[in-house]
Amino acid sequence: MFSRDMTIASFDPELSEAMEAERRRQEDHIELIASENYASPRVLEAQGSVLTNKYAEGYPGKRYYGGCEHVDEAERLAIERAKQLFGADYANVQPHSGSQANAAVYLALLQPGDTILGMSLDHGGHLTHGAKVNFSGRLFNAVQYGVCPDTGELDYAQLERLAKEHQPKMIIGGFSAYSRVVDWQRLRDIADSVGAYLLVDMAHVAGLVAAGVYPSPVQIADVTTTTTHKTLRGPRGGLILARANAEVEKKLNSLVFPGTQGGPLMHAIAGKAVAFKEALEPEFKAYQQQVVANARAMAQGLIERGYKVVSGGTDNHLFLIDLVDKGLTGKAADAALGKAHITVNKNTVPNDPQSPFVTSGLRIGTPAITTRGFKEEECRELAGWMADVLDDIENEDVIARVREQVTQVCRRLPVYQQG
C-alpha cells in the first residue's frame, strides 16, 4: 500500500536535487532552443497522474486488456481534439515521439529500399528525413534536397529536378532548422507529378499551424506528422494526422500498433488531450502571433549588430545565425552564451565548413521565452545582450554583466508563477 505523503525528496535526495536543480535552471536561464517549451501545470498534472499505471494495447473500444473504459475516453478526447485543432479527418495520438510517428508512416506506406526525397540535415532537415546515420537513411534509398546557396530559401527547382530524376515513392516536407514559409501546394504538385506520397513533418510549426499563423499542410499532404511539444506546448510525444483515406488510415493504425509500438503511454495521451484543448482557446493564437513577432524582433536586432541570419530573417518561430564571417564556431558561441545563462544550440548552416560536432551556426527559437511573457522589447534587448557576448566571447566581465541582466528579467517574468 502506498501513502500519498511519499515524496522523492525524502526517499531519494540525490535524484530530488537533480530535479530541483533543473527546475531552477529553467526559471533562471533564458531558453532559446527552438524545440523546447514549457508545458502548463495542467499538462504536468496529466503526465503525473495514475494513468501511467494502465496498460491499454490497441485502440479505444478495441483493447487487448480489460479495465480500459476510462483511458478509452481520454484517448477519444485527444483524437477528436487533434482532428478539430488541425482540420484533419484522421488522428493517431499514440506515437511516443515525432521520430516514432515518422517511422510508422514510412513502414505503413513504403517498402525497405524504396526511394524517399527529404530535406538534407545540413540544410535544415531532420534526422528522420533520410539522414545516413538514421533508420530512414538506412532502410530507404534517401535522396536529399536543400536550400538555394544565395538566398537560404528552399530550392524548389532542385527538389523538382531530383523528383523527376529519382522517382521517389515519398517526398518529405518539413524541417528542424528553416525559417521561411514552405509552399506545401508546390510540394504536392511535385509529388503528384511523379506519383509519390507527400508526407509533411510539421513538428516545429504545429503550434503556429494550429493557430492559423502558418499555412497548414494537413489537407494537402497525404499524411502529416508532428511532435506535441515544441510550439504546440504539450507533453513530449508524437501525432499522426491524415486526410480521409480508409486504406491509408488502416495501414497507419496497424503500423503504430502493433507494428512499431506496444502499449501506449496513457498519461502522455492525457497530456496531449489537455494541450490540444489549451490550443483551441483564443489566447493560443495570440501566443503564436507573439512567438513570430519575437523571432522577427530578435533576428532584426542581431542583423543590426552585424550578425548574418540565414535567409535574412524569419517567418516562424526560429532562425539561424551564420557565424562563418565572424570567425566563430557554433560550439564556442553556445558555450559563451551558456555561461551568461542564455541557452541555445549550436547548429550547422548551409555549406558549413565545420563538423556537426562543432558547426558554424546557432539555432535560435522563441517559443519558450514567449511562454514566460517576453514581448518584442525584451527580445530586442536580449538580441543586444547576445551580441555583446558574441562580440568578445572571452570577456568574462561582459558575460557576468549579461548574466545579471538575464537573472533580473527571469525574476520579473517567471515560468511558473507562485500562487
UniProtKB/Swiss-Prot annotation:
Named cofactor requirement(s): pyridoxal 5'-phosphate
One Pfam family from the record: SHMT
GO CC terms in record: cytosol
One MF term in the entry's GO annotations: pyridoxal phosphate binding
EC class (word): transferase
Protein's cellular compartments: Cytoplasm
Binding site for (6S)-5,6,7,8-tetrahydrofolate: L121, G125, H126, L127, S355, P356, F357
Pathway(s) it belongs to: One-carbon metabolism; tetrahydrofolate interconversion; Amino-acid biosynthesis; glycine biosynthesis; glycine from L-serine: step 1/1
Family recorded in the similarity comment: Belongs to the SHMT family.
PANTHER family: SERINE HYDROXYMETHYLTRANSFERASE
Protein name, UniProt field: Serine hydroxymethyltransferase
Encoding gene (name): glyA
